UniProtKB/Swiss-Prot annotation:
CDD domains: 7tm_TAS2R40. GO terms for molecular function: bitter taste receptor activity; G protein-coupled receptor activity. Several bitter taste receptors are expressed in a single taste receptor cell. It comes from Gorilla gorilla gorilla (Western lowland gorilla). The chain crosses the membrane at residues 15-35, 59-79, 101-121, 141-162, 191-211, 248-268, 277-297. Keywords: G-protein coupled receptor, Glycoprotein, Membrane, Receptor, Sensory transduction, Taste, Transducer, Transmembrane, Transmembrane helix. Disulfide bonds: none annotated. Residues 1-14, 80-100, 163-190, 269-276 are extracellular. Belongs to the G-protein coupled receptor T2R family. Gustducin-coupled receptor implicated in the perception of bitter compounds in the oral cavity and the gastrointestinal tract. Signals through PLCB2 and the calcium-regulated cation channel TRPM5. It is found in: Membrane. GO terms for cellular component: membrane; plasma membrane. This is Taste receptor type 2 member 40.
């Protein structure tokens, strides 16, 4: 059975690494919590008032709510793993964190993939019968596809609670040339089971996201070249919007892939627990949902207007509280 074994002591992580990781990932998580929380509040309020949300807004509501939970959970895990290492390295606690992290990440990747597929079908133009069929059916099928995504994420996350991770703490490791002892944290990861369940849970949404993003970029690029050939000029607002959409889609396609890779590397314990590479994985995992949430707000006219109203109302509210 292929396993990865790692061990670490309290001396392996410096105060600088702890502070750096908590500050950087904390800023990312708080940014993501504010962004995802804002989107959830806007669309959640409309849904609570009995309004029927359009399909795109419904996907964004589910994506933002799951990201809100994910970023809160990631921040909690970072605090626990760095400041309360003995508690975190209890097998039941460690497995609980990993299973929920994978479930929330898989759900997020599925929802992000469906959002990209939906926008691709709405915006892109391709003369293919399958594309036209999906264009007509996507609104009807989307509620069922979102529910199926949650079920699939759960199905490939829960098995990670058995025969994948094993961690323990030995508090009686003797220190050479000293009469004292130190704590040592051991972890074992069954790579065969992890690779199987992780890849099964992420393979389909990853391919969907890459395919939808690529088709969207090609369609927008083709339309932009057509506009350029008609001498509309690079200053045309429509062309600028298309170029901006191409850049945003390209950036988040790359970040989406890096996030999936970072999640796997972090889960597999290939790197030492407190190594710089593992810290980098944590930062990437926190950066993607935070950055995408901000981009969703800035790229959506309705959310952008709501954010400006919110920014205007907060100082007025704080001023009223001080009176």
């Amino acid at each position: 059975m292929a396993t990865v074994n790692t061990d670490a002591t309290d001396k392996d992580i410096s105060k600088f690494k702890v502070t750096f990781t908590l500050v950087v990932s904390g800023i990312e998580c708080i940014t993501g919590i504010l962004g995802s929380g804002f989107i959830t509040a806007i669309y959640g309020a409309e849904w609570a008032r009995g309004k029927t949300l359009p399909t795109g807004d419904r996907i964004m509501l589910m994506l933002s709510f799951s990201r809100l939970l994910l970023q809160i959970w990631m921040m909690l895990e970072n605090i626990c793993s760095l400041l309360f290492r003995i508690v975190y390295n209890q097998n039941s606690v460690y497995i609980l964190f990993k299973v929920i992290t994978v479930f929330l990440n898989h759900s997020n990747l599925w929802f992000a993939a469906w959002l990209k597929v939906f926008y691709c079908l709405r915006i892109a133009n391709f003369n293919h019968p399958l594309f036209f069929l999906m264009k007509r059916k996507i609104i009807v099928l989307m509620p069922w596809l979102l529910r199926l995504s949650v079920s699939v994420s759960l199905s490939f996350s829960f098995p990670l609670s058995r025969d994948v991770f094993n961690v323990y703490v030995n508090s009686s490791i003797p220190i050479p040339s000293s009469n004292s002892t130190e704590k040592k944290y051991f972890s074992e990861t069954n790579m065969v089971n992890l690779v199987f369940f992780y890849n099964m849970g992420i393979f389909v949404p990853l391919i969907m996201f890459i395919l939808a993003a690529t088709l969207l970029i090609l369609s927008l690029k083709r339309h932009t070249l057509h506009m350029g050939s008609n001498a509309t000029g690079s200053r045309d607002p429509s062309m600028k919007a298309h170029i901006g959409a191409i850049k945003a889609t390209s950036y988040f396609l790359i970040l989406y892939i890096f996030n999936a890779i970072a999640l796997f590397l972090s889960m597999s314990n290939i790197f030492d627990t407190y190594s710089s590479w593992n810290i980098l994985c944590k930062i990437i995992m926190a950066a993607y949902p935070a950055g995408h949430s901000v981009q969703l707000i800035l790229g959506n006219p309705g959310l952008r207007r709501a954010w400006k109203r919110f920014q205007h109302q907060v100082p007025l509210y704080l001023k009223g509280q001080t009176l």
